[in-house]
């Protein structure tokens, strides 16, 4: 990385062999990338349109998306912005649309087969959220309601295979961390 950072989120694009990381608490709008096939340091890719520490990220091999996150100045400065970049071209992120609520520590997964990005849970307005939202990768737009997690929580690990997705773990209201898994 170009500087010491923590609590970053990232996504990868195997088609062009790049991995993307950022933003972090230290640099809330910075996106960096590495070339997976070679050793070496990260380089500047561009910046996000809004600060988004604690955002979730995913990629479909063409675009990379960042969801929500927060700006400096405290936990109350959350965003509902969906930002994207074209993974093959260096440059700044652009606005894709909005999530249903502003928050951070979301989790998300991309399902290439049915061209959807699914965003799960998160933390907003002093509440651990149970919402599951989605949007299609075919064109920019706002997210829509998909359903609910069994328990609202943030910091969930997610993965999808084009048919379904699994959301595991996370931090529910009142803690401690959970071993709960949801399947969609």
Predicted regions and their residues:
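Polar, enzyme-active/binding microenvironments
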Residues: 1-184
